[in-house]
């Protein structure tokens, strides 16, 4: 609830909230309980502030197949009723995409659209593998900076790329913001957007992300409009 009210103060009109429901279940809370509580809070906030939302449920790389599948099945009843997609997040260096083929075959059987965190740790192959696994969007994707072949793959398949500048600086996925590849991605026709990743951990907002890129000369104000249109698309 608080999260949606906070982003509404930035004039955000639609927000996709992602989290890992498995981290909230316990002996007294089922997946249904977790999702009902989450969606109830978001809906209360929507009625108060007018900002619309959807939830992306995250599988975690360090969870086994059985655990991740249990989450997808446990949240399936909410798909189209507040849940819009699934995701795979976590340490991609230790758990590369090559380990998750079966998970996403099962996700497709359950009719989940999905985005996948890939290319944050420096492995461009994870991006390729995520696309081949059926991802319609890539979280981060900065590893394909300078890799025109993979950028062309994203462009040709209309893959959304969800960049997160401050988070990437903090995790050392990039070293300096002035060289951040958003402009490169835009110039090469990629459907790129700017995101916060984790507002609380990174201590940022969407407004701060966009202003930081503008202040470093990475983008100009007209490109901010393009990035927002890409996010909406």
Residue ranges and their predicted role:
Residues 12-15, 49-55, 80-84, 110-112, ...:
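Short, well-ordered coil/turn segments that N-cap beta-strands
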Residues 32-50, 101-115, 157-158, 162, ...:
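Alpha-helix-loop-beta-strand connector modules within alpha/beta enzyme cores
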Residues 1-18, 36-47, 162:
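Alpha-helical scaffold segments that flank or form the walls of functional sites
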Residues 84-97, 102-173:
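Active-site core of metal-dependent hydrolases
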Residues 32-36, 69-73, 98-104, 175-184:
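Charged helix-capping and loop-helix junction motifs
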Residues 218-233:
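Mid-to-C-terminal alpha-helical segments outside catalytic/metal-binding sites
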Residues 3-27, 52-58, 84:
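Divalent metal-dependent hydrolysis catalytic cores, especially in the metallo-beta-lactamase
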Residues 115-121, 190-205:
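Short acidic/histidine-rich active-site segments
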């Amino acid at each position: 609830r608080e999260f949606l009210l906070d982003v509404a103060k930035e004039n955000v009109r639609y927000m996709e909230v992602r989290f890992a429901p498995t981290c909230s279940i316990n002996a007294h809370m089922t997946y249904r309980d977790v999702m009902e509580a989450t969606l109830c809070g978001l809906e209360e906030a929507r009625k108060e502030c007018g900002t619309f939302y959807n939830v992306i449920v995250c599988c975690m790389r360090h969870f086994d197949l059985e655990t991740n599948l249990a989450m997808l099945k446990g949240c399936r009843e909410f798909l189209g009723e507040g849940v819009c997609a699934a995701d795979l997040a976590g340490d991609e260096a230790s758990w590369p995409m090559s380990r998750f083929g079966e998970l996403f075959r099962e996700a497709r059987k359950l009719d989940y659209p999905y985005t996948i965190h890939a290319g944050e740790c420096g492995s461009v192959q994870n991006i390729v593998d995520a696309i081949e696994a059926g991802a319609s969007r890539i979280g981060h994707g900065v590893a394909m900076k300078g890799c025109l072949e993979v950028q062309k793959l994203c462009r040709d398949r209309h893959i959304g790329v969800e960049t997160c500048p401050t988070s990437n600086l903090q995790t050392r996925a990039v070293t300096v913001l002035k060289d951040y590849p958003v402009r490169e991605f835009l110039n090469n026709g990629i459907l790129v957007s700017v995101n916060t990743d984790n507002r609380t951990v990174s201590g940022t907002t969407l407004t701060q992300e966009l202003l930081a890129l503008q202040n470093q000369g990475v983008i100009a104000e007209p490109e901010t409009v393009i990035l927002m249109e890409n996010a909406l698309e």
